Each structure stands twice: as C-alpha cells, then as structure tokens.
C-alpha cells in the first residue's frame, strides 16, 4: 500500500498492515460468507494457515493438495476437532476466497508445446510485500521470490497478461 512512500515509521506501518490484514481476512472473507448465507469459509484457523503458507511460498509452484498435506505434515493444523488432511476441495475454496479478495493473485502455468493452460502447479503472489513481511517477519532470505512478486505486479500494472511458460521440465 505504498507505506514507504508516505514516510511512516515502522511501528505505524505495522499497525496499518495489521489493519489491512484484519480487514481483508476477517471482514472481507469471513463476514462476507456469513452475509451471503454461505458456509464455505468456516474455519478461521485454516484460513490463516493457508494465508501464511501462500505468503511463505510466493513465486513457488504449488498444488492445492500440497497445501493441505504440508500443513498437516508440519503439524500446523494440530487440533482435537480436526481429523486428517483438509480435502483439496476445501483448500481450493479457501484459496479462491483469498483470490476473490485480491489478497493473493494466481498465475497459471502454460504448456508451450501443448498450447494450453495446465490445471496444476500455478504460482501465487501476495498483493503487497509489506503484508508478507508483516505476516512472516522481516527477513532477508528468499529475496528472489520477493523480487519475482514485485516484477509480476509491475507487469500487471503495465497491462501485460502474465503466465508461466513450461517446456518439458524447464520454466
């Protein structure tokens, strides 16, 4: 949201980022579902874990099934009420809600030889790197994916249609 451009100190910036995160996740996603009378997004803990996973893996090829499996395998969804891995359908529903809120953007993979978009292993980018830093903490690792995130949004801003090209195993 251009926090650096307006000269906010880090403490005020974190308060602003917390407000943006809370508004998008709590109001725009969870409350919107309630107002619509839908019960698609019912688990705020799962939603937050998916947000954290996607934020930590921006620019990486991800399948919906790998999100649920990773959350369970790393013990991030340990809860007495929860039984097993969330279904791919459930995870996809939560990811779709995040995409509808414009918190994350998805980029599809394109098979150059087959000349078609593939349904799996797309990439996700967070709308603002400041939000990622707020969620995961400020760290200097993974600067390549953070830069890729910035480039993706700059290409969108300039009007380009962006997709991932794939030929055999090369991207």
Describe each region flagged by the PLM.
Residues 5-171:
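Accessory nucleic acid-recognition modules appended to NTPase machines
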Residues 1-2:
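Amphipathic alpha-helical segments of the small helical/lid subdomains adjacent to P-loop NTPase cores
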């Amino acid at each position: 949201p251009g926090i650096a451009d307006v000269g906010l100190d880090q403490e005020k910036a974190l308060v602003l980022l917390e407000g943006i995160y809370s508004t998008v996740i709590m109001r725009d996603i969870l409350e919107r579902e309630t107002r619509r009378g839908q019960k698609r997004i019912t688990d705020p803990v799962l939603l937050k874990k998916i947000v954290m996973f996607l934020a930590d893996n921006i620019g990486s090829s991800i399948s919906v099934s790998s999100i649920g499996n990773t959350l369970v395998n790393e013990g991030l969804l340990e809860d007495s009420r929860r039984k097993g891995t969330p279904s791919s359908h459930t995870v996809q529903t939560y990811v779709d809600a995040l995409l509808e809120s414009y918190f994350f953007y998805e980029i599809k993979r394109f098979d150059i030889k087959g000349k078609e978009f593939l349904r799996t292993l797309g990439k996700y980018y967070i709308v603002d790197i400041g939000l990622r830093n707020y969620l995961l903490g400020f760290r200097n690792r993974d600067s390549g994916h953070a830069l890729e995130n910035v480039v993706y949004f700059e290409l969108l801003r300039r009007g380009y249609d962006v997709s991932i090209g794939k030929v055999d195993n090369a991207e």
